[in-house]
Amino acid sequence: MQPGSSRCEEETPSLLWGLDPVFLAFAKLYIRDILDMKESRQVPGVFLYNGHPIKQVDVLGTVIGVRERDAFYSYGVDDSTGVINCICWKKLNTESVSAAPSAARELSLTSQLKKLQETIEQKTKIEIGDTIRVRGSIRTYREEREIHATTYYKVDDPVWNIQIARMLELPTIYRKVYDQPFHSSALEKEEALSNPGALDLPSLTSLLSEKAKEFLMENRVQSFYQQELEMVESLLSLANQPVIHSASSDQVNFKKDTTSKAIHSIFKNAIQLLQEKGLVFQKDDGFDNLYYVTREDKDLHRKIHRIIQQDCQKPNHMEKGCHFLHILACARLSIRPGLSEAVLQQVLELLEDQSDIVSTMEHYYTAF
């Protein structure tokens, strides 16, 4: 949670909100931030945290107040950062029986079910001091923000395991998701293509890398030299675009350097980005400067598949399969010492897409 991080001067157009996964999720936020978020000017009922559109939240806290109405309960929930009112609708009564039981056995069964339901209601009754989890949409009623629950339940947490887990989870989610401004990669890419001259050098390199990837995939290129990419007209035209060089914090200079050395350098950096993602790789430590496209190297696919297939027959791998690091170690021994984790991950994903292997659990794979 960062001070002022919920403020965003410019709203993302509502048509692009669906590109942000936070919009469709139940956002796990501190209650303080739920109370401080500003409502969208475009769509009432949607709130913004650091540019992220939020309409549903997930809170966990202690009940500090209970009010009962005919149709709902109103719980005051405190998570130690703030207190918010949660409207939790009562469950419909489905106990009524339309016709009298025709036998004593049916009467006995009905009585037992009624007693069971009463026991469940008693055990799950929420009182002051209980821990409650609420998931629902944010509403404003009489200028007070509240949550209208779609799901709520009492949390049985005598040794605070669940609450401690939430306390450890939230800072990580904030750091990795909520405190990162919402950016639409599709929109940024479209803007970059329409005006590539407005990019700085790292952004232009990243865009060139993406366009090179598309070229390699569309043409099913198996291997290439850097010089061959430099001869592709569309890629060369993009690399020739002027870039922005920031001379100081308040001064921006436009500079165009189209020397062959500069062109060679930007292509080299673009290919390096592809290598870091495991999309291309080199054999024999790159002595021949030849790059291989991971997706098209069927021989590498077969060898990795064979390693998994053979090792999964061994007793210690039959149940869970082979771990990623085990496959990597075997591949480096039998295929190539310099095989990177990124390349192996790409191969495993391709094999899994083709149903040659399956992931039994996180980082474990097996073959049939």
Swiss-Prot record:
Region: Winged helix-turn-helix (wHTH) 2; residue ranges are 296-368
Compartments annotated for it: namely: Nucleus; Chromosome, Telomere
What ranges does the record give for the region Winged helix-turn-helix (wHTH) 1, renumbered to this chain? Answer: 191-295
Determine if DNA-binding is one of this entry's keywords.
Answer: yes
Upon changing I164A, the result is: Defective of TEN1 binding
Alphabetical GO CC annotations of the entry are: chromosome, telomeric region; CST complex; fibrillar center; intermediate filament cytoskeleton; intracellular membrane-bounded organelle; nucleoplasm; nucleus
Q: What is the effect of changing D78A?
A: Defective of TEN1 binding
Which PANTHER family does UniProt cross-reference here? Answer: CST COMPLEX SUBUNIT STN1, REPLICATION PROTEIN A-RELATED
Family, as annotated: Belongs to the STN1 family.
Report the protein name in the record: CST complex subunit STN1
Source species taxonomy:
Eukaryota, Metazoa, Chordata, Craniata, Vertebrata
